[in-house]
Amino acid sequence: MTYDEIRKEARELWLQFFRDAWRECQYEAEFAEFIGTHELKSEKKVVDKLQPWLHILDDSIQWLANLWAILDRRAYGQQEASSQLKCAWVLLGASCAHAAAVRRLVLSGLDGPARAAARALDEHLSACIAMLHDDELAAGFQATESPDEFWYRNLNTKALKKHLNAVESNCGLDASISTDMREWRHGELRTFSQTVHPSYLAAALTMKTFAADAPETVANAILGSASAASERTLDFACKTIWYFSRFGFFLIYNGYGGRPAILQLDKEDEMHQMVVVGRDVLSVLNRKYWEYEIYPEQNGSGDNG
């Protein structure tokens, strides 16, 4: 069926039912075009107002996609590939999609849904680190027929924290920094979870949002509106990918606990060059702007969270 065919069929139904009700038709046939125009206006405001985080996310997605492409060359169609390789392959691929969803939704002015995608991004990248840390966990993850049960048993907050702490310690991260990072992540996830499980406040702040171009004002956001709250969303997504670039990358190219790495560095390969150099670029950008605030008055009051 073509777009014109279903559009004609639907319009005729609207006209018929309004006619049967003895009322003038109120149907807006150009509503899809209206939404498209609305999205373009939001996108321009986001690009203008939500830097540096939007650009850093673009670079982060490019880095993540290159790393996935290297894994894809190794894993796709290879029956003998290890569970760790295959788990990293699928989890990084899904992470790329979630990161792209964060970007697209923020540009469209849909910050609430973007936060749900950012939460999924964090869960996938954290799970990937856990799989790279524990080969038995990776084997179980690949083979399980009850993914929900496996997740709650093996990748709950406490279990995941154990894996992340072990990896950070092995990489020489100071314990106090590890604690601070864990507390920050926990606080952000608690806020972002409000977009997944309905609450009155989260629903209200998805419906209406502080405008990116005038943060002292509130805008209707039911169809999307560039949001000042998206600063926090983009910031979290960028730092989540940065965290993986430090620790997940290390495990991919170095292995853990005496186990061999799942990738061997090829200094002449362009994609390998991209992920090695990009890892350092992302580190410099994120550390430079770690505490940068576009809307300090919003962040100080908890913005939309």
Which residues does each PLM region occupy?
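A cross-kingdom marker of C-terminal helix-rich interaction/assembly modules
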Residues: 1-118, 137-305
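Short, charge-rich amphipathic alpha-helical segments embedded
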Residues: 116, 123-139
